[in-house]
Amino acid sequence: MFKKNTTHLRQLESESIYIMREVMSDFQNPVMLYSIGKDSSVMLHLAKKSFYPGTIPFPLLHIDTGWKFKEMYIFRDHIASTSNIELIVHSHSKGKLLGLNPFENGGSKYTDIMKTEGLKEAINKYNFDAAFGGARRDEEKSRSKERIYSFRDSLHQWDPKKQRPELWWNYNGQINKGENIRVFPLSNWTELDIWQYIFLEKIEIVPLYFAAKRPVLERNGVLTVIDDSRMKIKSNEVIKEKMVRFRTLGCWPLTNAIESEARNVEDIIKETLIVKTSERTGRAIDYDQKSSMEFKKRQGYF
C-alpha cells in the first residue's frame, strides 16, 4: 500500500487520506468534528489534501460549550473565514438555556450534557451517519482499543465487545438507519507524530500550545489559566503570571497548563521527546471516576 522508502509520517498521511476517501464512498452525510486543537488542525489539513483540488465535501462541526479559551474562538473563526468550508456551531439547547457550567454543576455532569449530549443532539439534528474525530490510540487506554471505524448504535452508544474486525485497510461501514460511525483517521498517530507533521507541513495552530506568560491559579497542585472572570477565587488564593503552555485543549476550567519554555514547534518536539506522561493528564474530565473515558465513550462521547 505504501511506496518503497516512504517515511513513517508520509505513511501515516497516506493511511489517513485513504480513510477519509473511504468514508466518502461508504456514507451519505459525513461530518468532521472540529475541536480547534492540534489534532483537529492536522485532520483538517489532511482533509484538504484528500480532496484537492476540490473542496472538502463535508462540513466541520464544533460542539460549543461556551467555555473554550478566547484564543480558541478567535482561531476557529479565523479558520472558518479563510477556508472554503462550512462550519456548523452547535450548543446543547437545554444546557445552554440552564446556564450549565463546570463550577456549579461539576465537570462530569457538565461534560455529559454540554459535550456528549450536545454531540448526540447535533448528529440527530443534521442526520450525520459518520463523524470524523481526532482521537489517537496513544492518548488514553480506552482509545487504544477502539477501532478506526467505531460503530455507534441508535442511541450513539459504543460497546467495545461488539467492535468490528479491521483486517489490513478493510473497514466495515454497514449501518442501519439511525446508527452512525465515528471515524478516527489519526488512530495510529502519536503526539510526537502530530507535532512533527505540523512542523513538516507548516500547519497553523492555536497559540495556546506555545509557552507564554499567562495569569495562572495553582489549586490542588494543578495550574489553571484564568481566561475570564467566571471562576471564583478564594480569599487565600493568588493569581500569578507564569510561563506556561498547553499539551491539550478543552474547556478552560477543566484543562491544566504546564510550565514550559517551548515557544515554537521545534521546542515542543524536543519537549515531547522526553516527556513521560500522556497529554490527557491535563484533562480533568478523564479522572472524575474509574475508567472515566471509557464510560463517557460508551455513553456517546467523542
From Swiss-Prot:
Q: Which residues form the signal peptide?
A: none
According to the UniProt entry, what is the EC number of this protein?
Answer: 2.7.7.4
A GO biological process held by the record: hydrogen sulfide biosynthetic process
Nucleotide-binding as UniProt keyword: yes
Matching SUPFAM superfamilies? Adenine nucleotide alpha hydrolases-like (SSF52402)
UniProt pathway: Sulfur metabolism; hydrogen sulfide biosynthesis; sulfite from sulfate: step 1/3
Cross-referenced Gene3D superfamilies, in alphabetical order? HUPs
Domain of life assignment = Bacteria
Q: Which Gene Ontology molecular-function terms are recorded?
A: ATP binding; sulfate adenylyltransferase (ATP) activity
* Catalysed reaction, written as an equation: sulfate + ATP + H(+) = adenosine 5'-phosphosulfate + diphosphate
Q: Does the keyword Lipid biosynthesis apply?
A: no
- Classification via InterPro entries: PAPS_reduct_dom (IPR002500), Rossmann-like_a/b/a_fold (IPR014729), SO4_adenylTrfase_ssu (IPR011784), Sulfate_adenylyltrnsfr_sub2 (IPR050128)
Q: Which UniProt keywords apply?
A: ATP-binding, Nucleotide-binding, Nucleotidyltransferase, Transferase
> Of which family is this protein a member?
Belongs to the PAPS reductase family. CysD subfamily.
Report the function annotation for this chain: With CysN forms the ATP sulfurylase (ATPS) that catalyzes the adenylation of sulfate producing adenosine 5'-phosphosulfate (APS) and diphosphate, the first enzymatic step in sulfur assimilation pathway. APS synthesis involves the formation of a high-energy phosphoric-sulfuric acid anhydride bond driven by GTP hydrolysis by CysN coupled to ATP hydrolysis by CysD.
What NCBIfam families is this protein classified in?
A: CysD (TIGR02039), PRK05253.1 (NF003587), PRK12563.1 (NF009214)
How is this protein organized at the quaternary level?
Heterodimer composed of CysD, the smaller subunit, and CysN.
Protein's UniProt name: Sulfate adenylyltransferase subunit 2
